[in-house]
């Protein structure tokens, strides 16, 4: 992965990378692999009414990276006021759709911030999504954390992310923390939102073509969850649809 990133930067004549660091395992691994390229790396913390534990893990990880890799620098951009101002600007609504829209807006504010520093330094944004999120259940925000230039770990299953994180001696607090997208005002984690663990979703990805009679009741339940997410979020994984105009119409 490190060599792939270096080769991409070389071919693109780009001199550095920008990564958003959240305190989660995916961004911790991605930022570590980017740091290992030896190229300039800006790690950006972007708290939005964030839990103190997430902020603490993020800071510890960035401090660890900077102590180990001289090519790493960091920025702390507190987006609390920006987000709160946005919330006040849109109509009040008590629906779930309103809360979900605001959650996704947090992710999109972070994308805007990452690309500000990317353009400022003529760097590129490295995404932090793994294979289960990006190509299994589409568990990310379109034009939010899905808005990136390269995806170094998007071919790694979540279990492989954990294995590599341990190999690279990433902070155990990060490894042991329950995965969360950090987009809500409560303590819900990814499993709460999905209805299954990443280990279960991985199994479902491999069970997708098996006969249901070969599966346990829980496996059937998780497979149904997987298929539902995969179907409803498939638009995130495909190119933007283009209306093709027949030449004889022009």
Indicate where each model-derived feature is located:
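ATP/NTP-dependent adenylation/nucleotidyl-transfer catalytic domains that generate, transfer
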Residues: 2-19, 32-42, 49-50, 61-82, ...
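Conserved G/P- and acidic residue-centered "switch" motifs that form tight phosphate/ATP-binding loops
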Residues: 24
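Short, surface-exposed alpha-helical segments at coil->helix boundaries
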Residues: 27, 31, 52-59
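Catalytic-core regions of hydrolytic enzymes
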Residues: 108
